[in-house]
């Protein structure tokens, strides 16, 4: 069966499915991050739905990936930038086309604002980001 991937902003009734997908991120990277709280994740997803960006990828009507971002303010300036909050695609669906499409949606949402895209899982894909004109601004360092 041919896989057809569709990309769209979720409807309000799709948010529960988005929360469930994001818990799969926690399952995959649980050794790197603290335990996820269902209420906190649901609250964050709803906040992004109303005030930011959520864009999902669906393969044959099944949610396979999502990107979420929200406007934020620099600590030193009133100017806003776009802060990526999550960017997750299920492992068996990870490919350039899906990642590219979700990142292009993020860039379009940003318009002329700077986008900050931290990679904190250790699975950095520099070529993907370079192809889409992102610039490497350093590294995330972690203690504990």
Regions found by a protein language model. Give the residues of each.
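A short, internal acetyl-CoA/4′-phosphopantetheine-binding micro-motif in the GNAT/acyltransferase core
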Residues: 85-96
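Conserved beta-strand in the GNAT
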Residues: 56, 62-72
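A conserved beta-turn-beta hairpin within the catalytic core of GNAT-like acetyltransferases
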Residues: 73-84
């Amino acid at each position: 069966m041919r896989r057809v991937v569709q990309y769209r902003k979720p409807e309000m009734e799709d948010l529960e499915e988005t929360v469930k997908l994001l818990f799969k991120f926690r399952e995959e990277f649980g050794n790197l991050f603290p335990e996820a709280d269902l209420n906190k994740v649901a609250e964050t997803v709803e906040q992004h739905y109303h005030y930011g960006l959520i864009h999902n990828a669906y393969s044959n009507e099944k949610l396979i990936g999502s990107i979420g971002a929200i406007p934020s303010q620099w600590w030193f300036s009133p100017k806003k930038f776009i802060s990526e909050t999550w960017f997750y695609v299920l492992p068996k669906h990870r490919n350039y086309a899906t990642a590219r499409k979700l990142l292009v949606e993020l860039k379009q949402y940003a318009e002329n604002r700077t986008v900050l895209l931290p990679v904190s899982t250790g699975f950095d894909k520099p070529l993907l980001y370079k192809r889409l004109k992102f610039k490497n601004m350093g590294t995330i360092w972690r203690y504990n």
